[in-house]
Design a protein with these regions (language model features):
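Nucleotide-activated sugar donor-binding and catalytic core shared by glycosyltransferases
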Residues: 3-396
Length: 396
């Protein structure tokens, strides 16, 4: 966008992302906005994680401290969420941003969108809530309170249109074309003292504390079970960047007997996945990273019983994993709740290792990855946001 068409020399945006994945996408968006219009003086502030802060977004709310899971956990942490909500409202009132970009995190952001819309602030929702999967009734909140909805999955625009929501732009998935390993399997093994000639299984329990507490124990049980059958298999436990490795180490230390063939890494998720023959991954964005890297996987998840009971009444789809939802069928095994146990997980992971099955699933994942769109989603999202703000800004 050339500067002779741009109406403002400065632009103030509030950005709100509450999950680790949203924080990463927010950082990419901020960088894309700066690159698209270097002549604009941007001011970014809002609810941030590590990556948005690294992208020089001023933090009004540190969302690393709000990274929870489930309805019950949100209820017990309600004072923290209310305080975050209050501080963002104060910041929006005092600074009067030109627009607010809400990234995913619908439990919080849809409520904030309602307040912002009422005060006349332009609301842009990037990475639209997965209402097609559960709680579809919230589409009315999108219709009422969101001025521009940027979707990242190919079928979402049509889904929203069928519900009378037409201010939707499909930009593609931010991960498409951007998920690459910095180095190959041999280098990964060298750095982590692994044998490149022996099978490697990665374990990714998620980015929230409660995910570690619920999902990591059965993962460790699965690794122990597999080790009894195949002593040659090596395990890599990948800790999310926003988590303290000590949290995982405490869980690992509690296992008896201790696992001798487990490597714990804090960074290098993509390198670990690319080097792996198979992986067990908590349902979420990491499963798409694995698909883009072609890593055969088992998708796992475990909620508290009360949350699972409530969610079961709200979910509208047969599959839970994004990989299967995008495929439109079950390609990757999903182990949810009671099925997320060490014995079952061990069996499914072992089933992924034979070369014929492994190669077949890698081919399926490559086809699914192709449905995520072309590279440059953050740049396209930035262009849509800039065009929207320009078109809705009155001439001086």
């Amino acid at each position: 966008m050339s500067n002779d068409k741009w109406k403002m020399k400065s632009l103030r945006l509030m950005i709100v992302a509450g999950e680790a994945s949203g924080d990463a996408h927010g950082a990419s968006l901020v960088n894309a906005l700066r690159e698209a219009t270097p002549e604009i003086n941007f001011e970014f502030f809002g609810a941030t994680g590590l990556r948005m802060r690294a992208a020089a977004v001023e933090s009004i709310v540190d969302t690393d401290k709000l990274s929870l899971m489930g309805l019950w956990e949100i209820g017990t942490a309600l004072p923290k969420f209310l305080d975050a909500y209050r501080r963002l409202k104060v910041a929006a009132t005092e600074r009067n941003p030109d627009a607010v970009v809400l990234i995913d995190w619908p439990e919080f952001n849809l409520r904030l969108a309602r307040w912002l819309h009422r005060r006349g602030t332009r609301v842009i929702y990037y990475i639209s809530p997965q209402l097609w999967a559960w709680r579809s009734y919230r589409a009315r909140s999108i219709r009422r309170d969101v001025d521009l909805l940027l979707s990242i999955l190919p079928f979402e625009k049509e889904w929203y249109a069928s519900r009378g929501i037409t201010n939707v732009e499909y930009v593609g998935h931010p991960l498409a074309g951007n998920v690459v390993a910095a180095y190959d399997r041999n280098e990964f093994c060298r750095r982590h003292n692994l044998d490149p000639n022996s099978p490697i299984i990665s374990l990714l329990p998620g980015s929230r504390h409660k995910e570690l507490a619920r999902i990591l124990p059965p993962m460790i049980d699965a690794a122990a079970n597999i080790s009894k059958q195949r002593a040659d298999i090596q395990f890599v436990l990948v800790i999310a960047p926003n988590r303290d490795p000590k949290e995982a180490q405490e869980i690992i230390s509690a296992h008896d007997p201790p696992l001798a063939n487990l490597r714990l890494i804090h960074h290098g998720t993509r390198e670990a996945l690319a080097a792996s023959d198979a992986a067990a991954i908590a349902s979420g964005t990491a499963t798409l990273e694995a698909a883009l890297l072609g890593t055969p996987m088992v998708i796992v998840y475990k909620e508290s019983p009360i949350n699972w009971h409530v969610l079961g009444k709200l979910i509208n789809v047969e599959n839970y994993g994004l990989v299967n939802l995008i495929a439109g069928r079950t390609v990757v095994t999903e182990l949810m709740q009671q099925d997320c146990n060490g014995e079952r997980m061990a069996k499914e992971l072992l089933d992924l290792l034979p070369s014929e099955r492994n190669s077949s699933l890698r081919g399926e994942l490559q086809r699914i990855a192709g449905r995520l769109g072309e590279a440059g989603a953050s740049q396209r999202a930035a262009e849509k946001i800039l065009s929207f703000i320009q078109s809705t800004t009155p001439s001086s």
